[in-house]
Amino acid sequence: MLGGKNISEGYVGLTMDAYNKYDNIDFYNIIKKDNPKTVILYGMKKTIKATDLNLLSYIENKDNFIVKKIKRGNIIISSATRNFKNEMNSIKKIYKFMKNNMEEYTTIKPMFNYNNIDIYALSYKKNYFIFQEKCFNTLENIKFTQDEFDKMIKDIYGSLELLQKNRFLHNDLKADNIIHCNNKYKIIDWDKSYHLNNIFKSLFVRGNFLFNHPYKFYNKGIPLFFYDFLNFIFIKLDYKKIKWMLKLKSYKMMKGKITESVNSLIHDPPKNINKYYDNFSFALLIIFLAEKNNLDFPKDFVNNLLKPFRIII
């Protein structure tokens, strides 16, 4: 009997192969076991309710795809339904300005076409699945050369420029949310992203504590002492994923600079800082990954990313 394993698991999603003939833990076998009679298929502009669909025939041999099963989530009260809606709504919004370039900047990709509609996701009985291009290597798992590191910076900054041009914030930029895929570095996991014009979503604090500036949380009413407590909890929970970072000299250096920065921002509040939070996260990634891989990084470029936060390295 075949063994099997899931590819990765985060707070919101569990990733698995769409189809793997050598593994019995994949999307194909889940559908085979559950045998749903009715499924909801999600296109970018249309949702289809399909009954008695021979779904296995659409999944079989799709070994160039992975599937993200949306979970309830941890720590923060949530639900799989809400998390799925958040991610699909964000995906549809970025599709509006990326359109045919979406696969260049993201791993989001339709697995099949049904009734002339490209299908990007599927659900049944509160089970939710989003389809993605099959790629595995996230930044913390890559041994960079200088040329490859420079390419990563260029690729991701190009994505951030496009998001900022369209007033969109990914809001959860970190090492395991950037992936190397077909000679391109792409941002993944869009469930926390939002349009800066969305007043409702901008009222809530979301995103990773370690790669977000404390002022973001303070500005939403979270006292710094409580931020420090939550940060401590998340470090404990994510320790296996982030221990590579906690040992870095640059991590300790940036902790001091960030403390000075948040005190300055509280004393003299900045205007329109929200649109720069992804830049701050990206600057930290560049600094930490450079030390981890013993590489140089473009100091002037990073200082420019950090400028709105009054940080100079």
Annotate each predicted stretch with a short phrase.
Residues 165-180:
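Catalytic-loop of the protein kinase fold
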Residues 186, 190-297, 304:
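C-lobe/activation-segment region of protein kinase-like
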Residues 159-163:
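Conserved hydrophobic alpha-helix
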Residues 13-15, 28-29, 36-106:
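ATP-binding glycine-rich loop module of kinase domains
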Residues 102-149:
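Conserved structural core of kinase catalytic domains
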Residues 19-31:
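Conserved N-terminal boundary motif of the eukaryotic protein kinase catalytic domain
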